């Protein structure tokens, strides 16, 4: 799910609901909702996605703490994503939450009931505590991580904290 405009969040989620109507999950098919990332999804749409996840008892996942640019975007309202979104006139009424990525998700009610956090490349000790406390799950994408030259992933720190961590592949855009 992608839509950074809070004014169209309801329309976006209605399209999602239409798409899943009539799909009956079974042992071989499950449904999930995946708001993309904090720089492509408004806080309003994140909240609505979480509500849909809870209402329909479906998996919810998002890309989070993937890049230093994302951390800068949320914490200070500066950097690459601000420039990019301004180019598309998408930050009209947006104000930076002035929070780290994980604290941002927690602040909007996303971190609960086993949500899936994709990447988590840049985490503080407090954020790791929060991931553990909320029983959130982490997906580490090693090829994407290597492709973009990120710093060491906190994989073993997460594993040693008994945080559920899985390996993922991310998109073809970040794999050779």
Enumerate the predicted regions with their spans:
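Metal-coordinating catalytic core of metallo-dependent amide/deamination hydrolases
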Residues: 1-115
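Active-site-adjacent C-terminal substructures of enzyme catalytic domains
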Residues: 38-41, 107-176
